[in-house]
Amino acid sequence: MTISDKIRVYELSRDLKLENKDILDAAQKLSISVKSHSSSISLEDAKKIKNLINKNSSKKILSVSKSAIKAKNENPKNNDNKNNKNFSNPSHPEKLSKEGLNKKPLLIKPTNKVVNSLVSSNIKNPNPPTIVSNLKSQALSKNQNKTNTSVITTPNLKDKKNPSALQDKKPLKNSSGSPAKTTARPPIQLIEKPKNLANSNRNINANKINNSVNQKAQSLNRADNNKLSRADNNNFPKKNLNSPNVKSTPELVGAPIRREDPKINTNRPNSNSRQPSSNTQISANRPGGQNRQGVPNREGGPYRQGSPNRPGTPYRQGAPNRPGGQNRQGVPNREGGGPYRQGSPNRPGTPNRPGTPYRQGAPNRPGGQNRQGVPNREGGGPYRQGSPNRPGTPYRQGASGIRKPVAPNELMQLQKTNASNKEKPNISNVNKQKIEGANQKTKAPNSRLNTSPSPTAKKPARSFASNTKKPGRTDWDDSAKLEALRNKNPQKQRQKVHIIGENDDSLTSETSGYSGEKVSILSASLARPKKEKSEEIKSQKPSKQFKKKKKETTRQRQKRRAMELRAAKDAKQVRPEMIIIPEDNLTVQELADKLSLESSEIIKSLFFKGITATVTQSLDLATIETVAEEFGVPVLQDDVQEAAKKTVDMIETDDIESLIKRPPVITVMGHVDHGKTSLLDSIRESRVASGEAGGITQHIGAYQVEFEHESKKKKLTFLDTPGHEAFTAMRARGTKVTDVAVLVVAADDGCRPQTLEAISHARAAKVPIVVAINKIDKEGASPDRVKQELSEKDLIAEDWGGDVVMVPVSAIKKQNIDKLLEMILLVSEVEDLQANPERLAKGTVIEAHLDKAKGPVATLLVQNGTLKAGDVLAAGSVLGKIRAMVDEHGNRIKEAGPSCPVEALGFSEVPTAGDEFEVYRDEKSARAIVGDRATDARATKLAQQMASRRVSLSSLSTQANDGELKELNLILKADVQGSVEAILGSLEQLPKNEVQVRVLLSAPGEITETDIDLAAASGSVIIGFNTSLASGAKRAADANDVDIREYEVIYKLLEDIQSAMEGLLEPDLVEESLGQAEVRATFAVGKGAIAGCYIQSGKLQRNCSLRVLRSDKVIFEGNLDSLKRSKDDVKEVNTGFECGVGCDKFSTWSEGDIISAFKFVTKKRTLNK
């Protein structure tokens, strides 16, 4: 047992037959340092603990024994005097609270012995339940009388499962110690215990009827007795563990109590008799409430432990548990359930309102004054301001009583003493039921039970802490609550506090705080609402507002669904960030298509603006901008059309004196394949068209030819523009610098989209138009039809009365070529084209590209002045110094006059096609101009890139989350800047709803190793257009597994890119029909069934999908799991054969059913969908 003369706590507790907590508490009181039950203490300390425990237990047992003997033999007055003496010693309450009350093992056996000595021998149940204890009064003041005794008969409460045994003893009289004047009571009578508890109860009730007094006295008596009855198990007198078992048949019963003093409360027990037993503690009751366990009373009063019920409440033996909570800490809920204590009214004139700081209307004690320093209640009773709060209850204002703190361990022990003996029954269930029935039948007629409780009383919203509620038990055990429901508003919600029950951890009790503190852990008997009335009402209102929800009407449901569908549709539609208007007007349908809206939305918007429009009605630019801005989409005029306008006049005022005639610049425009380049070849007598890739022009060709007119040689400068739709910007640049526009229209094809575009460009540049109707030699050519179509575009031929020159020509057979040139010269002479060749050159960059040998190369058209080799010029934001110039034939020239196209070398970087250039006298001036332009150009380029990449973030994220958005990264390198622009413009026209094309880099020039590294890092595909690979680029591409695609024709390039975008799309599943069969017989097989079928068309395949139709209605859709023919499993059965069909999930076949077989196949999606 010992190690180095030491002993462990748990060994000492085992020797003393105590719990570890008792030893720990004793060690704490003796200031012995211990931490847990496994701590070691010296033998000397162990001896001290044993002496302390034995001393306390002997004192408690001795005090209980003496009080029982005195109650039997002495006069009440003598009892009072002795009680006062006992209570005058202040050491007793402290020892009781801190030493005696927490010793559970010491409380069990002595209690049984005392009980056996005081119990009638007629009852054979173990642990007879009745003892008599004399509660002696206490003097609260020197000037107060010291009389009053009360003797009650209480059953043993050791059996928690049979709480109804409490009902067999009705209280005779109960009063509490008070400073009021008192009168002497009759002597205590010794009576024999009744043979059974029911008869005893009847005798007690008969005595009550004979000695009935007013209702106030009864309420006090019943409340006091209720307190004693609930706490009687804690107040059985103790004896030493070695004392013999004393048996005695007689019991002590209280003498008839005088009813004249209804408010005298003398149940102040002798401190020596208040020894706790294994269940609950007995405590002197204070009128209207109970003290906290283990907390001393006010000055001069006894130590009130575990007070019983308030006066005015019925005797709560076996009453149902409190609704919404458990009993006091450590005390298990009552089981079985006693009579339903409905209607027991509160003290006269006052409903017991839970949570109120004091009870109004309770009368003062007659013939006496209240306790010292306590003012009277408004109704005559004492105002309980001096009492400290109960643990966890709302703080009562004005509390001034001094209470002694109690350690958490002691408070826990007081509250859980009932748990140790809950399995020792005293009364059997049969006897319990008999006693309950007897008690219910023999209740005193003057019992204060309310016979008509409010049937509509609403239960407060309290939840039970324990789910062990017995059936048949009621939810109310306090008549004051029913009274409050009848007289007040519906009961407010109580504060949500934790009610400690029998299953709660003891650590919770230990940490529940000391007395005088506000703690959130309460015993059920002390629970009170914390909030005031106004706060409860406020907290209750929001819950009422959300209880009922209006039912949605049909119209609201339809409206909500329509809004959801519209929102879903809007989410899928990706509106453009901006729209570009290529022409002056658009129809309503065209505008709706550009805005990704329904035409009805556009019409509705116009209607609200006072404009009535139809789908085919054209809208001007101002109206288009208004409608588009309403939907949050800005409108930009076609940049191409703006580029076609001549923004700078090349002729200045200083040039007027030196002006001479200059050759006209003629731009040939028209739809693709209408013969523009062939017409120029006929004029130049060359074969350019045959040498172009794909037979189409993809660059601006600048040529100067000489033509003899009226025996004079005239120079003409021609610009050949691409006719493909991708080269709109090129056509616009050609129109910007032109003097005369030649519109080529095929006689067999008529006006096409690019034809109309060329007309708009020419009109934007305000240049005259000469129409060349080509291919008149072809079959089916109709020049008149072309004239008719052009007249619809306000181009009326001269022979039709208009002012537009139209010449039918044949480029292949060179018919009417001279007439066309004459008409061009006539028109140019009318324009009076002049320039100053003596000034510094000014002009426009027609085309530019990066040559791997020559570097940046630009095709320049001099419009005024003379350009010489060595000149310093600024083309937009690019600085250059002319190193060399060559003409269209490749011949090197030193200077170029007005209207002369040349290729110039010597630029710092590739200039932008369409920029205007100007020669400066020195490089310093040129650099200053270029610096300013470069800053502006960078800002503009950045804005354009952000605008082009700006995709709606909401739609982008939505599509990415749905897995619908795919990206195709490209790096674009082309031979010239114009080709880069054309390709980028074409890529912008591709659908981007599900696949987004990202061009990470686009520039003219050859493909370099830097491009390969970028493509490898970003997972991009390199697109090369009419360009080559730099040295080492091919090897780097192979090493990094980079895909390089080279193209010479823009058609093929765009087709491949579109195919790659479609390859990123998920394929569609399309249903493909296989065949149809008819059910002609059914066969039951096990739990399922087989359908005998005849194949009417197509075939049936095993594991294919099928639908079963009955009377043209689909009754099943699933898979064909079994397919047999002549008891053999087959993969498929063709038309005209019979077979057996089985489905695992369908067996209700019927003759005449039609089986439709189908399967799903994948279909490649296109971007058009």
Swiss-Prot record:
Residues 670-677 are annotated as: G1. Keywords: Cytoplasm, GTP-binding, Initiation factor, Nucleotide-binding, Protein biosynthesis. SUPFAM superfamilies: Initiation factor IF2/eIF5b, domain 3, P-loop containing nucleoside triphosphate hydrolases, Translation proteins. It holds the Pfam family EF-G_D2. GO terms for molecular function: GTP binding; GTPase activity; translation initiation factor activity. Residues 69-108, 139-568 are annotated as: Disordered. The keyword Transmembrane helix does not apply. Residues 71-83, 92-102, 157-171, 472-486 have a biased composition (Basic and acidic residues). Residues 695-699 are annotated as: G2. CDD domains: IF2_eIF5B (cd01887), IF2_mtIF2_II (cd03702), mtIF2_IVc (cd03692). GO terms for cellular component: cytosol. Belongs to the TRAFAC class translation factor GTPase superfamily. Classic translation factor GTPase family. IF-2 subfamily. This is Translation initiation factor IF-2. The gene is infB.
